Design a protein with these regions (language model features):
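A short acidic/small-residue loop/turn micro-motif
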Residues: 32-35, 90-91, 160-163
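Active-site nucleophile and cofactor-binding loops and adjacent substrate-binding regions
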Residues: 87-90, 110-116, 136-139, 299-306
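A charged helix-plus-loop insertion that forms the helical arch/lid used to bind
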Residues: 80-94
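ATP-binding/phosphotransfer module of carbohydrate and carboxylate kinases, centering on a glycine-rich
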Residues: 1-66, 76-81, 99-109, 121-131, ...
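Short beta-strand segments
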Residues: 8, 68-72, 112, 136-142, ...
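Short hydrophobic alpha-helix segments
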Residues: 29-31, 86, 157
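Conserved A3 ("GATE") glycine/threonine-rich loop of ANL adenylate-forming enzymes
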Residues: 13, 115-117, 141-144, 170
Length: 324
């Protein structure tokens, strides 16, 4: 049996899977993304996650035919590097991630943009399979986008799909990218947490950080936001409403430009909050869609939390074919 591993490297979690030739998941492992240290520490956690997934699949890492990694930041698969992964600790410069993992685990390693590989997974194996054009929107630590046109991933000049950095308010809130008014400055989980901390310093009350401490977390994960919403925590409700307003305007603007058939909502928050918030995104988009008599389908990512990792395994398979 030909086995491959795929890794989704996120701001709060590292998700690894081992799949067979049909991309059925035989083993998986999830680990927390380090909040301190250097890129080498993140690479060590990735390697540990792959080992864990391989063990569950009753395989050794050396028996894998290849490994794919979907990473944030500026990904250079040809040189095996990731640069400026701002949602990861101290990852401003370039780090040879592919080489570090290959030295540690053995099989060849391919790198891809995290959102692009997740988008291709949904287009090839998930909710996007009936469509020739779609926009993947991945709502998590940041807000990422992937574009499929005529059945193919569209990369532009290698930076297409950065939907989180579409401006939804001129001169608005500062984004982690350093610019102002980006959708991610309102809807990214990292920015939402930063805003929650600011409000607490000003004296506002919330259960968010009490839930975080009870769960033994250092960050406000998607699960913590979901629990706070169940409790109808006023701050959580207000910040999620603010995020949905920004998402609705930004995603609708992208739809006006591309006229895609479908929007696929994924990412940690998108998947965790689920169908009720898919419907709310759809509602938030409608006032901004020009062709509102035929809006695109808005669908929840079918592959769920594993979509990014499965997409990375799909990338590894494509790289094997290219090398053959």
């Amino acid at each position: 049996m030909n086995l491959r591993a795929g890794v989704d490297l996120g701001g709060t979690k590292i998700q690894a899977v081992v799949v067979d030739e049909r991309f059925s998941v035989l083993g998986q492992e999830r680990r927390a993304t380090p909040t301190k240290g250097k890129p080498a520490d993140v690479a060590a956690e990735i390697a540990a996650a792959v080992r864990g997934a391989a063990e569950i699949a009753d395989a050794e890492p050396s028996e894998l035919s290849s490994i794919g990694v979907g990473s944030p930041g500026d990904v250079d698969d040809e040189n095996g590097t990731v640069t400026s992964a701002r949602n990861l600790p101290n990852w401003e410069g370039s780090f040879p991630l592919a080489g570090a993992l290959q030295d540690e685990l053995g099989p060849p390693v391919s790198l891809g943009n995290d959102v692009n590989v997740a988008t291709m997974a949904e287009a090839t194996l998930g909710a996007g399979t009936p469509y020739q054009s779609m926009l993947g929107v991945f709502w998590g630590t940041g807000v990422g986008g992937g574009i499929v046109l005529d059945g193919k991933l569209w990369l532009g000049r290698d930076a297409a799909g950065e939907i989180g950095h579409m401006v939804v308010k001129v001169g608005g809130a500062k984004c982690p990218c350093g610019r102002h008014g980006c959708m991610e400055a309102y809807a990214g989980r990292g920015a939402m947490e930063a805003r929650a901390r600011e409000l607490v310093k000003k004296g506002e009350q919330t259960d968010l950080f009490a839930i975080m401490e009870k769960r033994g977390r250092e960050r406000l994960t998607s699960g913590i936001w979901a629990r706070a919403l169940v409790r109808q925590d006023p701050m959580a409700v207000r910040l999620v409403e603010r995020a949905l307003e920004a998402l609705g305007a930004g995603v609708a603007s992208a739809v006006n430009l591309l006229d895609v058939e479908a929007v696929i909502l994924g990412g940690g928050l998108g998947v965790r909050l689920g169908d009720p918030y898919r419907k709310r995104l759809e509602h938030a988009m409608l006032p901004h869609i020009f062709a509102d008599h035929r809006p695109p389908r808005v669908l929840l990512a079918q592959l769920g939390d594993l979509g990014g990792a499965i997409g990375a395994a799909l990338l590894a398979s494509q790289s094997e074919t290219a090398r053959a």
